[in-house]
């Protein structure tokens, strides 16, 4: 087992990464406050792992909420179902929520934990690659609105993150590839390109799910993320760099309809759009862009949305983004592989060119 610690002062917490962690009750129970525990999961994950978690909680008063599975259910209506379950069971402020599932479950559970009785504890048990390397770490919680992704939410840190890589054994190949988009994103953000080179050299074995490499990949991804979050918890500066490809990607999800593309699939195209704009702005070479595209393709990720989205609708969707300031879209671009920056003075004609290249 590998352990990381996200240093946020009194809000610091461990991230456990390993095999068969769902059999190690002490890892979970030592982070539970009070006697009441609510497990939030979905219809896909519940038959696979709910009983395992329940078996660790026999000394607690526990209940569960089983939600429908999918990004389209990441709404205030679904969140209200969790609130209702907590109130009906008379859970008090000392309770702990457990998010057992992927990013949608984790984001909604965290949002409920941030809001219920003005804040209760919660624990992340991510079961998808995307949630293990990204959404379970860092305290971002929230839901989608019909006009924009993750526009309603809060920062609320978990008490721990428990990553059992055996949950990836039941993850389908499309979901696994979706998680690889966020992994590749870290490769593009990390100085010296050590992680990017690791991914290039091992992409075949990683896609074949070689466990020793998966643990290392998840560990390095989480390490890179916590290094940034520890410096900028509330995304006032450097943490914004973690949104590479996300302004484009969120617009894809919003325009196509949530769930049409998996989040990581949208981010894959978004990363390529950001790198293409970086190339047109004179930062990246065509060879560097080709390297990035090649890695995304080897991870079985989409690289285009041609014929799927109207360019004008796409541009409108880009304006509904948390990074928009005074009506100006702020983008994360690459000066070179391993060095991202926040850009708000890009050439609008070049942005239009990129959107048209990818949409039409």
From Swiss-Prot:
Gene3D superfamilies: 3.40.50.1970, Dehydroquinate synthase-like - alpha domain. GO terms for molecular function: 3-dehydroquinate synthase activity; metal ion binding; nucleotide binding. Its EC number is 4.2.3.4. It is found in: Cytoplasm. It catalyses: 7-phospho-2-dehydro-3-deoxy-D-arabino-heptonate = 3-dehydroquinate + phosphate. Its main location: cytoplasm. Pfam families: DHQ_synthase, DHQS_C. Pathway: Metabolic intermediate biosynthesis; chorismate biosynthesis; chorismate from D-erythrose 4-phosphate and phosphoenolpyruvate: step 2/7. Keywords: Amino-acid biosynthesis, Aromatic amino acid biosynthesis, Cobalt, Cytoplasm, Lyase, Metal-binding, NAD, Nucleotide-binding, Zinc. GO terms for cellular component: cytoplasm. NAD(+) binds at residues 69-74, 103-107, 127-128, 140, 149, 167-170. Binds 1 divalent metal cation per subunit. Can use either Co(2+) or Zn(2+). It comes from the Bacteria. Signal peptide: none annotated. Catalyzes the conversion of 3-deoxy-D-arabino-heptulosonate 7-phosphate (DAHP) to dehydroquinate (DHQ). PANTHER family: 3-DEHYDROQUINATE SYNTHASE, 3-DEHYDROQUINATE SYNTHASE, CHLOROPLASTIC. HAMAP family: DHQ_synthase. This is 3-dehydroquinate synthase. It comes from Vesicomyosocius okutanii subsp. Calyptogena okutanii (strain HA).
């Amino acid at each position: 087992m590998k352990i990381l610690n996200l240093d946020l002062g009194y809000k610091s917490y461990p991230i456990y990464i390993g095999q068969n962690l769902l059999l190690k009750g002490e890892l979970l129970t030592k982070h539970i406050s009070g006697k009441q525990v609510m497990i939030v999961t979905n219809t896909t994950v519940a038959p696979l792992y709910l009983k395992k978690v329940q078996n660790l909680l026999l000394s607690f008063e526990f209940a569960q909420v089983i939600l429908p599975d999918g990004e389209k259910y990441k709404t205030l209506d679904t969140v209200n179902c969790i609130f209702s379950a907590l109130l009906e069971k008379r859970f008090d402020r000392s309770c702990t929520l457990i998010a057992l599932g992927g990013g949608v479950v984790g984001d909604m559970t965290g949002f409920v934990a941030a809001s219920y009785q003005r804040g209760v504890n919660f624990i992340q048990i991510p079961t998808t690659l995307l949630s293990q390397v990204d959404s379970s770490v860092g305290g971002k919680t929230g839901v989608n609105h019909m006009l924009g992704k993750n526009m309603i939410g809060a920062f609320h840190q978990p008490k721990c993150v428990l990553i059992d890589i055996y949950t990836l054994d039941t993850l389908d190949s499309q979901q696994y590839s979706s998680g690889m988009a966020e992994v590749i994103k870290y490769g593009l953000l990390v100085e010296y390109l050590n992680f990017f080179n690791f991914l290039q050299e091992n992409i075949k074995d990683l896609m074949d799910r070689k466990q020793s490499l998966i643990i290392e990949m998840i560990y390095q991804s989480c390490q890179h993320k916590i290094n940034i979050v520890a410096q900028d918890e509330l995304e006032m500066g450097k943490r914004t760099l973690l949104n590479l490809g996300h302004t484009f990607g969120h617009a894809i999800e919003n325009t196509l309809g949530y769930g049409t593309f998996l989040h990581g699939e949208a981010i894959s195209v978004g990363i390529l759009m950001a790198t293409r704009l970086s190339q047109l702005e004179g930062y990246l070479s065509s060879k560097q862009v080709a390297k990035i595209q090649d890695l995304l393709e080897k991870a079985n990720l989409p690289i285009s949305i041609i014929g799927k989205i109207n360019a004008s609708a796409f541009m409108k969707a880009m304006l509904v983004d948390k990074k928009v300031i005074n009506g100006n879209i702020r983008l994360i671009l690459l000066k070179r592989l391993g060095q991202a920056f926040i850009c708000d003075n890009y050439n609008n004609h070049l942005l239009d060119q990129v959107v048209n290249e990818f949409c039409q």
